[in-house]
Curated annotation (Swiss-Prot):
UniProt-recorded name of the protein: Large ribosomal subunit protein bL21
GO cellular component: cytoplasm; ribonucleoprotein complex; ribosome
Organism annotation: Erwinia tasmaniensis (strain DSM 17950 / CFBP 7177 / CIP 109463 / NCPPB 4357 / Et1/99)
Pfam families listed in its UniProt record: Ribosomal_L21p (PF00829)
HAMAP family: Ribosomal_bL21
Name of the coding gene: rplU
Keyword terms, alphabetized: Ribonucleoprotein, Ribosomal protein, RNA-binding, rRNA-binding
Amino acid sequence: MYAVFQSGGKQHRVSEGQTVRLEKLDIATGETIEFDQVLMIANGEDVKIGAPLVSGGVIKAEIVAHGRGDKIKIVKFRRRKHYRKQQGHRQWFTDVKITGISA
């Protein structure tokens, strides 16, 4: 059984017991969360596709950890003009373990 849900402007395909990295959620570690923006649920041959959401579809998950991703560098450079600019960015994330999928 797997499902597709939407969180943080992105869509994620998950199954029960899987750990997923999402955009940062302001919820404490160890708490549970329910995602109700479920786009699709598949259980073998039984597939439910929402238009746009599956009615009654809920994905239950537990917050595992919060953290920051790897640093990326943004570089601006103009040749022959002695102009260089560097900026770094580390995106916050939340790791979530899927505990249940229901339709």
